[in-house]
């Protein structure tokens, strides 16, 4: 269950409000640590990765560079267990709160957001 709903109920509810069309079949997806509230990463979901995420309760994304489904942690073991999912007001961006098993970033850092932007 995600947010207290089973996957099939969640799909019925969200399919009515998900807007994959705006992003040419992709939804930008913000992944947040449910405990620390840190933003871990931003990735892209297509309909298949969205459904796999609901079914497995682990995050799946669409790799734009490799043009394939990507199970986060499938190779590294750094999976992300889904706690909750929420859509923004337009239905075109997804927020997923997770319990991560290890770092989210391929650099080994907890978050992909570690590059400070300097002000001039």
Cite the ranges covered by each PLM segment.
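C-terminal binding/interaction regions
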Residues: 4-26, 32-40, 45-120
């Amino acid at each position: 269950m995600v947010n207290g709903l089973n996957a099939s109920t969640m799909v019925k509810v969200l399919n009515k409000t998900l807007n994959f069309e705006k992003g040419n079949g992709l939804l930008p997806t913000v992944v947040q640590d449910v405990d620390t509230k840190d933003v871990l990463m931003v990735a892209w979901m297509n309909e298949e990765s969205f459904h796999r995420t609901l079914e497995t309760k682990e995050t799946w994304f669409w790799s734009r560079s490799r043009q394939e489904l990507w199970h986060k942690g499938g190779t590294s073991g750094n999976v992300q267990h889904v706690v909750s999912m929420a859509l923004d007001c337009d239905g075109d961006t997804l927020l997923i709160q997770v319990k991560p098993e290890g770092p989210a970033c391929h650099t080994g850092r907890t978050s992909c957001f570690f590059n400070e932007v300097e002000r001039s």
